[in-house]
Amino acid sequence: METKQTDLVIVGAGTAGMTAAIYAQRAGKQAVMLEALSYGGQIINAPDIENYPGMAHVSGFDFATALYEQAKELGAEFRFERALSIEEREGSKAVLTGKCTYLCSAVILATGAKNRPLGLEKEQQFIGAGISYCATCDGAFYRGKTVAVNGGGNTALEDAEYLAGLCEKVYLIHRRDAFRGDERDVEKLRQKPNVEFVLNATVTELLGENRISGIVVKDKNTQETREIQIDGLFIAIGQMPDNTAFSKWVTLDENGYICAGEDCCTGTAGIYTAGDCRTKTVRQLTTAAADGAVAARAACAEQS
């Protein structure tokens, strides 16, 4: 197995991770970024970003690509490998993947979060057969059809708006009577004749044999249930972190997020965290970028 020496290893290439790489390279440190999937994280699927200062309208893909190219131009190295564990070796941190061992002085964990499932029977079976977690990835398959979006945050609202431009009918299902996302986006959806809000309701059952054909939703107030016939279900009920591989080195809260304050310090020398994977009240592109800058500066200062 290959062994590589570097100053800093950043686990995760989302907004936080790539911002950390930019700041590290500008500080004269060599950063290696490890990403199991694609750069950009969850934002790469957003059709339009309106809440990042200085960028009134930009797609998630273009935003992520700009960060990626900026970090690369500054000399950051990207490797598409999954970080499996961290070890201590003769005063250095060793980050192990299936292909290489990276020796470094500091590690920034910017692993982000993954889509949260409903946890219903047949959910895994129907992935790719009517169930999706990415409207911009799979929405075109449902052009002219009837779909449902389950969720109440900005992602769900963005998904519903995007799908409303493709689909004959969009049901937007939320367990509360008010959405958590931006009110401006809610008002946009209210004006669309092919979008129907199903509030105070939860999806309790997935219908279909080889692919989804409908859902059962339960009204939280009346306890009554109804069947809704759909061709596709887009699940956008939030995210959950995946930090268990690093639990030896950092403290995780009850939900699996890395415990750290605004200084992005984990309490373990040489290990920092940034972005959606850490404990915080606001998870936005701006806060992820801020975390990346803070974590990188702290990691670089420790090496000075």
Where are these regions (language model features)?
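A Rossmann-like FAD-binding core segment of flavoenzymes
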Residues: 4, 71-96, 101-102, 164-261, ...
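Beta1-alpha1 glycine-rich phosphate/pyrophosphate-binding loop at the start
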Residues: 6-74, 157-182, 253
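Short helix-loop-beta connector
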Residues: 2-5, 140-146
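FAD-site-proximal beta/loop scaffold in flavoenzymes
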Residues: 119, 125-141, 237-286, 291-294, ...
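Glycine/small-residue-rich loop that forms an oxyanion/phosphate-binding "nest" at active or ligand-binding sites
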Residues: 78-143, 152
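Glycine-rich, N-terminal phosphate-binding loop of Rossmann-like dinucleotide-binding domains
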Residues: 13, 111-112, 237-238
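Residue-level detector of alpha-helix initiation sites
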Residues: 14-15, 38, 113-115, 153-155, ...
